[in-house]
A protein has these predicted regions:
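Short alpha-helical segments that sit at the start of domains
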Residues: 2-36, 106-109
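Electrostatic, structured charged patches in enzyme active sites and in nucleic-acid/phosphate-binding
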Residues: 2-11, 117-393
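Short amphipathic alpha-helical interface segments
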Residues: 29-52, 56
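Short, well-structured alpha-helical interface segments that form or flank functional binding sites
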Residues: 37, 60, 111-114
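A short, highly charged nucleic-acid-interacting micro-segment common to nuclease
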Residues: 43, 100-117
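Short, solvent-exposed loop/turn segments at secondary-structure junctions
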Residues: 45-48, 87, 216
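Short amphipathic alpha-helical interaction segments
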Residues: 52-73
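Accessory beta->alpha helical hairpin/"wing" motif in late/C-terminal subdomains of nucleic-acid enzymes
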Residues: 72-98
């Protein structure tokens, strides 16, 4: 059995000792805020791989909960799941929770759940509230809602749409789709109708779509592949990319994606970051060039950290129509190395620069991902949440 040490105020320690004494326990395990977040993440996602879970939490924290039989590792899914004990602990914590469901081991369901978990854990690390149980809670920002929580037998308000999550940042309301090689096709009209209907009551400056996957390479692998569609109602994601009127952003579910989401969570992030990067060289873009973020020494400047490649392409075309052969791009290191250099620098379309850590700290305060506090968890009644230790299986 692994041990976990939580520094707690003396009053909490006394209540902890009293609980053990009254219930005849020789010892008991006091749960921390971090423990509860692990359990909640598993309740929302259903299953999470060790890779994603141990990016936000330590291996010991995960193994502690496993030893206490609140979570277990599934060999079939190759991921962590909640146990009935873990669900009971969550139910006693006072949270509003989605319904507990029995795990499914069909391969398509496992794949879908693990992809969703990558989106959720990336958003969680970006400090986004992912613990929503209804769409109306998207009124607060930043927040993320999972439509599958409302998809059950006899009720499916989202129909056959493929949206994985809804994200509300300071300026954007986004429908997130998982897009990787072989992902298939979508009925775009149905997707946009459902997106509008389910978010109409939530004010946002701009609606957008996000294509997410494990990496930029996976997303572009699908977009660059192309495929022949027999059903005229359906479109490939490449066709969606070409025809969608809304802004379309690419998001990897990794550290870069976490930082990208944090940037997108800052109100007016495009102008603010352009001003930070260019300093005294900043000149506002022309009124008829909304795809630009600034002019730098007379050259169009695009802050590309949100990975709206279509906006970059529009900026390149607009600049060339004005007789300017190259624009200037600034983005995060992975974005520059894996996408922008090949597409824009090597083709002579742009000079590409990496956004410095100093500029990011000026915008965000800190570039470190969110971590929950290492403090004891208190219920709404002010008591600590404790459970008797169980024998390790």
């Amino acid at each position: 059995m692994f041990a976990e040490i939580v520094i707690a105020p003396e009053t909490a320690q006394e209540r902890f000792r009293q609980t053990a004494g009254m219930k005849g326990w020789k010892s008991c395990m006091m749960l921390s805020c971090r423990d509860l977040d692990i359990l909640r993440l598993l309740r929302w996602c259903r299953m999470i791989r060790s890779k994603e879970l141990c990016e936000a939490f330590s291996k010991d924290e995960v193994l502690n909960l496993s030893a206490a039989q609140m979570i277990r590792f599934s060999d079939a899914a190759k991921a962590w799941l909640l146990t009935p004990c873990g669900n009971r602990v969550l139910d006693s914590a006072g949270f509003v929770l989605p319904p507990a469901t029995a795990p499914t081991y069909r391969e398509p369901d496992i794949t879908r759940r693990l992809r969703l978990a990558q989106i959720v854990t990336t958003a969680y690390a970006a400090g986004i509230n992912i613990f929503l149980t209804k769409e109306s809670e998207l009124q607060s920002t930043p927040s993320l809602f999972l439509p599958f929580l409302h998809r059950n037998r006899g009720s499916n308000p989202w129909g056959s749409t493929r949206v994985a999550a809804l994200l509300h940042t300071s300026d954007l309301m986004c429908a997130i789709h998982w897009v990787s090689p072989g992902i298939g096709c979508v009925a775009l009209t149905d997707e946009l109708t459902a997106f509008q209907n389910h978010t109409a009551a939530i004010p946002a400056k701009q609606r957008a779509m996000i294509f997410a996957a494990s990496s930029y390479e996976e997303i572009l692998g699908e977009l660059d592949a192309g495929q022949e569609i027999q059903n005229t109602r359906l479109q490939s994601y490449r066709e969606v990319y070409d025809c969608l009127k809304l802004p379309l952003l690419l998001l990897p579910c990794n550290e870069t994606g976490c930082l990208q989401l944090r940037i997108m969570g800052v109100p007016n992030y495009r102008e603010l970051l352009a001003r930070i990067i260019l300093k005294s060289h900043y000149v506002p873009p022309p009124a008829n060039r909304a795809m630009y973020d600034a002019l730098y020494q007379g050259v169009p400047f695009v802050m590309a950290a949100d990975m709206d490649l279509r906006r970059i392409d529009a900026a390149v075309e607009a600049a060339r129509s004005d007789g300017i052969l190259q624009i200037v791009l600034a983005a995060l290191p992975e974005q520059v190395e894996t996408v922008l250099n090949r597409r824009y620098r090597e083709t002579g379309k742009a000079r590409v620069f990496t956004i410095t850590d100093a500029a990011l700290r000026e915008l965000l305060g800190s570039t470190a991902p969110y971590t929950p506090p290492d403090l004891p968890f208190y219920t709404s009644e002010g008591s600590v949440l404790d459970v008797p230790p169980l024998k390790a299986p």
